[in-house]
Amino acid sequence: MADAPVGPAFAERGLDLSLRHYLAEVAAPTPTATGGAVCAITTASAAGLVAMTARLSTFDGADRLAADAELLRSRAQALATEDGAAYAAVLAARREGAAALRAAYARAAEPPLAIASTAAETAGLAELLARCGKRAVRGDA
C-alpha cells in the first residue's frame, strides 16, 4: 500500500504517521519540522529501551527506573509534536512581520532545549542500567 504524498504532515499528524511515511517526511525537501521531531522520537525510542531493560532487571530500584523512563518517553513524544507546532508557527509568522517572526523563533527554541534535557536524562538512566541492569540486556539500555 502506498503512503500518502510527502509534505508538511508531521506538524499536522505527528506521531500518527506510519513509520514509512515519517521517514519519507524526514528526507523530503520541504520546509517541515523534522530536526527536533527526529531528536524527540529518537529520545522516546531510547527511553523505551531503557524502560524495557529496567523491567527485565531485578536490582533494587529497577521498577522505579522503568517508571522514570516511561515518563521520559511520554515527555519526548509530546515534545515531538510541540516542536512541529512551534515550527509551523514560525512559518505562519513569516507573513506577519519581523516582530512576530522574532517571537515565533524564540518560542521555537524552547522544544529543542527540552528535547536535549530529556535526552540527557534518558542517557543518565541508560548509563546506570549499563552498569546495574540484567547482563543479557545491558546493551539495549
Put a short name on every predicted segment.
Residues 28-51, 137-141:
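Conserved phosphate/anionic-ligand binding catalytic regions in large, soluble enzymes, centered on
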Residues 59-96:
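A structural-propensity feature for long, helix-poor, extended segments
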Residues 52-60:
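Transmembrane signal-anchor/signal-peptide helices with a preference for the extracytoplasmic
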Residues 2-17, 41, 118-122:
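Polytopic transmembrane helical bundles with strong interfacial aromatic enrichment
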Residues 18, 22, 45-52, 79-82, ...:
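Amphipathic, well-ordered alpha-helical segments in soluble domains
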